[in-house]
Regions:
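Serine-dependent carboxylesterase/thioesterase catalytic core
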Residues: 38, 66, 82-193, 253
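Conserved alpha/beta-hydrolase
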Residues: 55-74
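Solvent-exposed loop/turn segments at secondary-structure junctions
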Residues: 39-43, 72-76, 105-110, 131-135, ...
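C-terminal catalytic-base region of ester-bond hydrolases, centering on the histidine
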Residues: 205-309
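Serine-hydrolase catalytic core
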Residues: 171-231
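Short aromatic-enriched loop/helix-cap "lid" or pocket-rim segments at secondary-structure transitions
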Residues: 48, 137-142, 231-236
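Extracellular/periplasmic catalytic domains that process cell-envelope and extracellular macromolecules
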Residues: 26-30, 60-61, 94-95, 103-104, ...
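Flexible, membrane-associating and regulatory peripheral segments of lipid-active enzymes
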Residues: 1-61, 309
Length: 309
């Protein structure tokens, strides 16, 4: 009897890890493919480093089908949105899926909203991560010191284009068209307001509330950080802290206020993360006292899965 019991327990011990592994393998397995959309000065990979650092691999490891979009690093929401739409159509053709789940960081959020607005039949959900949905005080300041047609605007545009060209070279991309002025105008409070007038889906009508959770069959979600200097080892923490001064006492991740980042169902708007931490940058050097950014993407994939998306 003891031998039989020992054998049964041994078999159970061997089966439990297999069962747990099988359960974990489907944690992020959404019904529709996930498409990650980068923000301003963004890229797919730069010298082998993901813009969404370690996120695609973490999602794929537990079953998600993940694609990383590559749109203009510097351009208007509409121009980037058209580029994203073309890529979404290709992804649907390749996978045979009926729709995709869009997850956009920073300007990637309004870029995703554009696609959802013009082709709602191709989108299952839009998730905004630190999204510039109501504009940025930083963009407002830049536009103030570089007004339309000014020398300062021309100089800033040339510098931004040169920086983007270098990034594209190291990213090994052929390059999408770059239009810094279009990007800047899209990110100002006025520009974001004009964009939302055309694409209001999921955008809160109050100053800092939630938006509609579902519009035209598309689910809308958002989360963001509200800290600036989060890890002294991260070389981007100090710049985030300096940029955050533009917001005064308003909670911000350094580039976008917490309220501006709201879209649809607000999962949380006060993570101890700055704008780059939200994509697990720089190189995973994030706050030691907050949940891992990668975990948030995994949790969102599981949320989409449980919603049937």
């Amino acid at each position: 009897m003891k031998k039989l019991l020992h054998g049964a327990l041994l078999c159970l011990g061997l089966l439990l890890p297999l069962s747990a592994a099988h359960a974990a393998s489907g944690y992020t397995q959404t019904r529709y493919p996930i498409v990650l959309v980068h923000g301003l000065f963004g890229f797919g990979q730069l010298l082998g480093v993901d813009y969404f650092y370690q996120v695609p691999a973490a999602l794929r490891a537990d079953g998600a089908q993940v694609f990383v979009a590559e749109v203009s690093a510097l351009n208007s929401n509409e121009a980037r949105g058209e580029q994203l739409l073309q890529q979404v159509q290709k992804i649907i053709a390749i996978t045979g899926a009926a729709k995709v789940n869009l997850i956009g960081h920073s300007q990637g959020a309004p870029t995703a909203r554009y696609v959802a607005g013009v082709r709602p039949d191709l989108v299952a959900s839009v998730t905004s991560v630190g999204g510039v949905n109501k504009g940025s005080a930083v963009a407002d300041i830049v536009r103030g010191v570089a007004p339309p047609g000014s020398v300062s605007e021309a100089v800033a545009s040339a510098v931004a284009k040169a920086l983007t060209a270098v990034m594209q070279f190291f990213a090994g991309t052929t390059g999408q068209p770059q239009y810094p002025v279009g990007a800047l105008d899209s990110l100002t409070t006025a520009g974001a307001s004009a964009f939302s007038a055309k694409f209001p889906q999921g955008v809160p009508t109050s100053a800092c509330g939630e938006g509609d959770y579902q519009v035209n069959g598309i689910r809308y979600y958002s989360w963001t950080g509200s800290a600036t200097v989060t890890n002294v080892l991260d070389p981007l923490s100090v710049p985030m802290g300096v940029l955050g001064l533009a917001f005064g006492s308003t909670p911000t991740d350094g580039l976008v206020s917490a309220c501006s980042a709201h879209l649809g169902q607000v999962i949380r708007d006060n993570y101890r993360m700055n704008h780059v931490n939200e994509i697990n940058q720089s190189f995973g050097l994030v706050s030691l006292f907050e949940v891992s950014p990668v975990s948030l993407y995994r949790q969102q994939a599981n949320r989409l899965k449980n919603t049937g998306l």
